[in-house]
């Protein structure tokens, strides 16, 4: 995997146990197209942060279609979910699931309700504010597209990982998401510094690029014009690992 290091030395972020007064960072993992690898990226990114000593929570925003718990291997441990917290039916600590393999990693599963409007701006904001008191990083695993869950996932973001496949349709949809981040995120509405955007290119196959069946890294960079954080090669190992 080719990668560019995300800035983990920012003074606004502390490692777990650091006594200095600093605030958490909210990172959304998003895209305009489904099936590009957002949830796998969310799980891997959150795990990487936790292994580096940052207390990290990853939240599934895909209401009605949750699968972060499956990827994280905790599907049988879900008792309460994100919507339960928002509706005051459970506390954050009742809903959070501690990862069995990493002490600094916690998961909040999405609700299986069919009500796509179950997430509210005030409710999500309240939960994010509470989590900021305890965590170094809050990773928001967004559903695809621009439905309510996706908008809520990006609204409070400080940084964004935009996951795209090297296909024209995927890149075009990612460009639309970048437009929403720059105009509809809370930072944009409040006149603050814009959300810091990074690109993750997934399912990259150099042979198909050479044959003209896929866009090259440079092609994608020319279109989206944001820094490339990492390139994940197309591999059957990813599918096997998730199963």
Model segments located where?
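Acidic-aromatic/histidine active-site loop/patch
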Residues: 1-26
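Walker A/P-loop NTP-binding active-site region of P-loop NTPases
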Residues: 26-91, 137
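Flexible glycine-/small-residue-rich
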Residues: 31, 60, 109-112, 164, ...
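Residue-level signature of catalytic and energy-coupling elements of molecular machines
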Residues: 34, 85, 108, 141, ...
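P-loop/Walker-type NTP enzyme "switch/lid" segment
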Residues: 61-133, 239-243
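Residues in the short beta-alpha loop(s) of Rossmann-like NAD(P)-binding domains
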Residues: 62-64, 203, 235
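Conserved catalytic-core segment of NTP-binding enzymes
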Residues: 132-133, 137, 143-229
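Short, glycine-rich, amphipathic interfacial segments at transmembrane boundaries or analogous
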Residues: 231-241
């Amino acid at each position: 995997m080719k990668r560019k290091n995300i800035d983990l030395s920012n003074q606004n972020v502390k490692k777990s146990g650091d006594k200095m007064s600093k605030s958490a960072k909210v990172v959304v993992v998003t895209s305009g197209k489904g099936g590009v690898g957002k949830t796998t990226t969310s799980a891997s990114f959150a795990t990487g942060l936790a292994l580096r000593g940052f207390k990290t929570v990853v939240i599934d925003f895909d209401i009605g279609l949750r699968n972060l718990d499956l990827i994280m291997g905790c599907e049988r441990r879900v008792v309460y979910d994100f919507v339960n917290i928002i509706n005051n039916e459970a506390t954050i600590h009742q809903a959070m699931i501690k990862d069995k393999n990493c002490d600094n990693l916690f998961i909040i599963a999405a609700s299986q309700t069919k009500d796509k409007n179950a997430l509210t701006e005030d409710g999500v904001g309240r939960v994010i504010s509470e989590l900021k008191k305890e965590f170094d990083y809050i990773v928001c695993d967004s559903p695809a597209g621009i439905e309510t869950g996706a908008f809520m996932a990006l609204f409070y973001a400080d940084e964004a990982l935009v996951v795209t496949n090297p296909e024209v349709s995927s890149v075009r949809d990612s460009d639309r998401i970048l437009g929403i981040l720059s105009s509809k995120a809370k930072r944009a509405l409040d006149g603050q510094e814009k959300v810091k955007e990074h690109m993750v290119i997934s399912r990259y196959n150099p042979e198909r690029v050479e044959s003209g069946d896929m866009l090259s890294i440079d092609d994608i960079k020319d279109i989206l014009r944001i820094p490339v954080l990492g390139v994940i090669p197309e591999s059957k190992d990813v599918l096997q690992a998730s199963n």
